[in-house]
Design a protein with these regions (language model features):
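Active-site catalytic microenvironments in core metabolic enzymes, especially phosphate/sugar-handling
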Residues: 1-194
Length: 194
């Protein structure tokens, strides 16, 4: 039996949730493969799938470490239309964004918390950066491109189905593989009605 996750293992302490889960796996002789940054950077990984979900073409890495991707839309799109497209494509409950006054065409993506890569997106000439966990001052200080915070879960969860399909092709005689039933967006939104 094997458990495959992309949560990074930082400690093996039994006084926190992750440590207790890992201890239980070990006690029951269940292997664990914990992918995180390597799955973000991998060809066909989180960022490739995220970019493809958003219809981006001509993908290149955002960083030297191959974190994030840059691509272009077939046709440029007004920002409001693109934000609705992001919500629909990723199944977001909502998102936060800023408007830099340009149409959306050259887009950088970073699954999970990639706000530290805003300078790379700007340097690459992107007009939009889709990621998550952006800080207030990221939004306030960035005027060169649209920032779209689509949420941590929606920007990473895109890899689950393709990863299961890949593992099933690689190990066709293995026991049934599936994604966790309880894994879902932890953050809910209450939006002021106009």
């Amino acid at each position: 039996v094997m458990n495959c996750t992309w949560h990074p293992v930082q400690t093996l302490r039994t006084d926190d949730r992750q440590g207790r889960i890992l201890t239980k796996l070990t006690e029951n002789r269940i292997s664990a493969i914990c992918m995180h940054t390597n799955l973000d950077a991998a060809e066909g990984g989180v960022n490739d799938v995220l970019a493809q979900k958003l219809g981006l073409e001509g993908l290149t890495p955002l960083t030297e470490e191959k974190i994030g991707r840059i691509g272009t839309l077939k046709c440029e799109m007004p920002l409001v239309e693109f934000t609705r497209f992001v919500i629909e494509s990723l199944g977001c409950n909502g998102l936060r964004y800023t408007d830099c006054g340009k149409p959306v065409h050259r887009v950088a993506v970073g699954g999970g918390a990639c706000g530290d890569y805003i300078p790379q997106a700007i340097a690459a000439g992107c007009d939009t950066f889709v990621t998550s966990d952006l800080r207030y001052h990221d939004f306030l200080d960035t005027t060169e491109l649209h920032l779209i915070d689509a949420g941590h879960f929606p920007t990473e969860d895109v890899i689950c189905e393709p990863l299961v399909a890949y593992l099933q092709r690689a190990f066709p005689t293995a026991i049934v593989m599936k994604t966790a039933a309880h894994d879902c967006e932890a953050i809910q939104y209450c939006i002021k009605e106009k």
